[in-house]
């Protein structure tokens, strides 16, 4: 989609989103995208009330980006370059550059040790004229095969090593001391006990979950970040962009009601999930909004209900550990 206008005095703008599918066969996915946002006047959108699919008259930030994505079964490669412009700033500090931004990932499978995911991200970020960060981050994520005991417990391990190499200048959150190398790690053990109750038209699955997680060392201060805890990231090794340090235990449960159909056809009718994080001690480096800075986090959960052929409704929530305050809730429907 593109839109462009021009009036007397060379007041004009151009916005464009272009996508190119570069696939030659079904064994991989390859595409190139281009985003262009330009205007000749900082107040042009507001003065002329420009409102289109691509433009909002209240826009004060422009983004220009070129991105290439490639992926196949066990690997991916993303290469991007971006330039951001803040129209409210009159000096060269209005520009921010992220060039390059390269992400690469590869999965290795072994019968004996499970899977290893290698992910690497290299980027250079320059903003406010003389502030910059150049970094190379490498992650190795280990996921051994799950083990089912005779009593029905499903046990699994998961671990991650992260190597961070960066050089920063005049940034607030990073050390300004030449090239810095850091190593972080985390290991987690999860156990669940799925139980099934069969009925005529429905069957229920109830699964209590337990996870213990430990990450040594010290993490970066994220106290000012806007991060929330939800059930989607409850059992994640790192619930933020950083690996949270310390010892913690996670308790939760999953309950599902599945409707039987003809043959092997079935549909999930209802699902309920709840969970909470118990930290060994308070973590002042975590944002208070996430509740992960406390010994007991919020109780987070998710409820999904399917209305036969009509659609479904999803409800996500977060309740303070004293069960008096509802800190977050979101309702979404799909028809």
Regions flagged by a language model, labelled:
Residues 1-335:
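Outer-membrane beta-barrel proteins and related beta-barrel translocases across Gram-negative bacteria
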């Amino acid at each position: 989609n593109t839109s462009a206008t021009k009036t007397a005095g060379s007041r004009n703008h151009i916005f464009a989103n272009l996508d190119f599918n570069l696939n030659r066969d079904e064994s991989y996915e390859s595409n190139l995208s281009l985003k262009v946002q330009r205007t000749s006047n900082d107040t042009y959108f507001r003065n002329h009330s420009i409102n289109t699919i691509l433009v909002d008259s209240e826009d004060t930030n422009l983004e220009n980006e070129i991105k290439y994505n490639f992926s196949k079964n066990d690997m991916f490669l993303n290469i991007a370059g971006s330039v951001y412009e803040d129209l409210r700033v009159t000096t060269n500090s209005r520009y921010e550059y992220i060039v390059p931004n390269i992400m690469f990932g590869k999965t290795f499978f072994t019968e004996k040790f499970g899977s290893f995911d290698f992910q690497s991200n290299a980027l250079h970020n320059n903003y406010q004229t003389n502030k910059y960060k150049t970094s190379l981050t490498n992650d190795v994520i280990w996921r051994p095969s799950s083990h089912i005991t005779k009593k029905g417990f499903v046990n699994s391990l998961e671990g991650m090593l992260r190597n961070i190499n960066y050089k920063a200048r005049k940034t607030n959150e990073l050390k300004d001391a030449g090239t810095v190398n850091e190593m972080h790690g985390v290991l987690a053990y999860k156990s669940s006990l799925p139980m099934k109750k069969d009925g005529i038209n429905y069957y229920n699955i109830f699964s209590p979950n337990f996870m213990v997680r430990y990450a040594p060392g010290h993490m970066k201060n994220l106290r000012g970040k806007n991060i929330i805890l939800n059930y989607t990231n409850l059992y994640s090794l790192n619930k933020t962009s950083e690996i949270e340090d310390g010892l913690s235990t996670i308790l939760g449960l999953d309950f599902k009601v599945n409707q039987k159909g003809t043959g092997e056809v079935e549909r999930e009718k209802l699902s309920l999930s709840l969970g909470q994080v118990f930290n060994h001690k308070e973590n002042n480096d975590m944002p208070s909004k996430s509740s992960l800075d406390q010994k007991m986090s919020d109780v987070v959960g998710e409820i999904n209900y399917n209305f036969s052929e009509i659609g479904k409704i999803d409800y996500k929530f977060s309740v303070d550990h004293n069960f008096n305050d509802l800190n977050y809730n979101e309702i979404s429907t799909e028809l």
